[in-house]
Amino acid sequence: MSEEVNVIIGHLDANGFLQNSELHFSKGDFLKALENAKAALQIENKNIKACIIAGRSATRLKRFDESYYFYKEGLKIDPKNKIIAEELIDLQKILLDHFDKMGIEAKEQDYNAVHFCSQDVYPEDKELFLLEKEILETKYKLENRLPSMIVDPIKRKEAAQILMKAHKIILAGETEDAIKQCTIALDADPLNITARQLRARLNQEKGNIEQSLQDLYAIPKENRSVDIWKFGGILLHQLGLPVHAEFWYRKATTLSQMKDIEAAMMFQKVRAERIYGPLTINYPIKVNFTKYGRSIFATKGLKIGEIAFEDKPVVLGKLLQYKDISACDHCAASLLTPAEYFGEKYMEFNPPLRSLIKEKWPKDESVRCSCQRQVYCNAKCQNEAWEQYHQIICPNKNVHAHALYDLHDNAGYGLNKDGIREEIWVPQYSPILLARMWAMIVMEAKRLMRKNGLSQPTFQHWAKAKTSLRKFIVFGKSNVASKLPEVFNMMREIFSDCGDGVKYEITEEEFNARYYQATCNLQSYSSSLSTPIHGLLKNLNGVNGITTMILLKLTKEEPKVATFAGMFPLHASLNHACDNNVEIIDGLVDGRPGVYVRVFRDLNAGDELFTTYIDTTMPRKIRRAWLFKSFNFWCQCRRCQFEGDGPNICTNCGKYAQEDKKFQHCGKCKKAWYCSLQCQKEAWVKGHIAICQLQHSMVNPKTIDTDLQDSTSGKGKKMY
């Protein structure tokens, strides 16, 4: 929202903004039409006319996610509104035409996330590697290689013959005898790599991991094949030495020139386990790596309604449309006041009622930063924010940061390079969130710098400082910096002077990477479970009297809470399915707003947990196109496999209907069409029975922004 609108908001009713919106729409100025419609909704959030004009304006601007959101909000107000129903149908047609023009219906490609995953060595791995090496040398007495020697050709031939005998014994199932024969062969020819590899395999089968690994370590590095390096990775992982396991898998991957997908996959499985293991220790889940990337699996059966796990954000920021609702800028706690909740009528309450509210309303401990641009629920949050990131982007310490908070206050509007006011920040979440990511990195790098008594962070310091953001994938290759030039330059200026002579250079590559890292992983959430109203009701418990009864009647309306976007490390590993089996809800984690991942359908041990990134009530073709556009994958879930795209093509066999005919739909769900009764029966058995009339999850999906992405924005997920 522009400054001009902010100045007058509150002095006009919703109808004033609505009239302005309609006027701008009629003139073709859809940006201003959308801006005024949003302003009307801020004043009167159940104004259905404002929802409609906002949806229309967003559609004209090709902001399809926003358009869909406003129409859905309108249907919440009036589920039978014919105008919205018709315009939603039109929106679906526009969406499909738009995606078709972009080539979105191109052939679906096979996808394997391992191609986009880094095997970079982590900064802290050097120390861990040395620690594991000491364990290998002292506990397992491993020798790195055999001493140089010359083997008698006769002995070498003798060893080969013994090895052939060992193979025959293996076929007979005599593993122990086969191991003995391998040992005899190695006594004759200690350099026989085949014998060492075979004995290692046999010892692993017997559970003798240490002996197996000793044979592999004895093989000179230059003689180790891809299979040997890969086998060593398996053994080291079994011994609980993940950094060495990664080292061996990395060698296998490099030696195979990335052709051995199994080695690359096993590397990522080890990495996922060591990164996420500590986070899942108290939950009935584990994080694994599949061809679709990091995934979460149940370790025991879970019933509907159970909480699979809780998560708290690494970094957060408000959604811009909630920027004026009071909340802690660090933890997202509601800072709702009596005046905000009860509105103008609060001043009309009689003295006893106001006195009771004042007495029982939770104590306000909120504090503001001296810059007056951030507010916190208490001094603890203020101190945490200061130590973690805020001192880098506080306008009182960094003069360039004023522009950042102005951009937030104006809901993404600012001056472009030509001095014209327009929307220069398109995403729904605040640009402050993006700035906090860099500020967190800078603060940690400076802390490490001071710890080592240096005046500048080293390369290692910067690498370690990025650890907290390591768990979040990045995908998207379009140049966002060129699409948001004003914000890109703003961030460069802000971090050109981070105090103490330290600066952080934000290149286009860095800007794009962090933008996508945020945009692809954000989840919306709020403090809806813990507001001052909840505190008031708790404090009123046991308080009797007429005034209390009156107050209780006045507190039946749900309080307005600010919605935030947060990056949650465990949650970020959840994959999507349109027939999701978990849903994301607001929760309290360690006393602060966070998210709960609640079971939506019964799970068995070993089942993968799936959330939904979008509104799954959309038609199949639109769902899949939207997911491809936003996340660069074609959904292959059961709902997408066994729902159809329309009456012109058989959902089961793909046969097209004749030009003047249409196929019959499923009589129950009406979302699948069949050319014959036989096809319908086949589809039912294959899987349609599982999704026919399957309940949709109506919980808020991921906070995604698709306006700056296109179908060529990424070739898959990449770990950053």
How does the language model describe each region?
Residues M1-K49, I53-Y720:
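Short alpha-helical interaction motifs and adjacent low-complexity tails used for partner binding
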